[in-house]
Amino acid sequence: MSSASVERIAIHGPVGTLDAHLAVPAQLPGNGRPGIVVAPGFPAAAGGGANSFRTFPGLVERLASDARLIALTVAFRGLSNSAGHFSLNGWRADLEAALDRIKEVPGFDGSLWLMGFGTGGAISVSLAGDRDDVTGVIAFAAPADFQDWASRPRELLSHARRCGAISDPNFPGDFSHWAKELQGISTVSSAAKMAEGDKKLMVLHGGNDDAVPALDARAIADAHGSAELRIIDGARHHLRHDPRAIATAIGFLDRRGRPVQVTEPR
């Protein structure tokens, strides 16, 4: 039996209602618990494929039950039943709305964490670099930047239509502006800004990731300087489904990003 309760909630986002799930530990201490917002990645196929948002309520339930965190996951615009259509800056704004929402949950103690997968991981690092209220980030399979998309914006637009992240044939109204947003987020630069603010960072990546090279993970970790980097042997891109990656992340959260204490042999 889970020691956490999960409820589906609506978040008032910048362009409409965002589908979200909130998980809270069964018993909260008087001084409260930290909060974590979980950001999904870009859909792999129609309905989400391996990145389907349908799997994320189970993840926040586990974070609330095992790590004793107040955990919230949000479907960005264009995903699940959320209003709107995909744009990179739009997803970033949606994540900001989720961060503001978790602060309203009774029992939140003020310590705010982010966990993101793929594009969601990159956006999480980007926000953490700019916001003073974020304690740390766990980024799974995050790209170092979006230059690959920026070099092929029409191909990305076609994929977004196929997978349902954009359902309006007239969107975007200004294609050049939509495409230019892809050049505006650098995970590497944001990781360096996180370090300046003394914010914790764990970077996890699959050793056999065929979507984002593991070199991107190393670049992000190097830019931060003291990030914990974990390359999961044999794992591919969708680390949401790799129990080793999730267990490693929960361990990091349990110690709140503090370095592992190694006892010297006597």
Task: Give the label of every model feature segment.
Residues 1-30:
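N-terminal cap/lid segment of alpha/beta-hydrolase-fold proteins
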Residues 58-81:
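Conserved alpha/beta-hydrolase
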Residues 18, 134-219, 223-231, 235-236, ...:
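The alpha/beta-hydrolase serine catalytic core
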Residues 116-126:
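Glycine-rich nucleophile elbow surrounding the catalytic serine of serine-hydrolase chemistry
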Residues 27-66:
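Short, surface-exposed "cap/lid" segments of acyl-processing enzymes
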Residues 126-136:
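Conserved hydrolase catalytic core segment
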Residues 106-118:
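Alpha/beta-hydrolase fold nucleophile elbow
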Residues 85-106:
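Alpha/beta-hydrolase active-site loop
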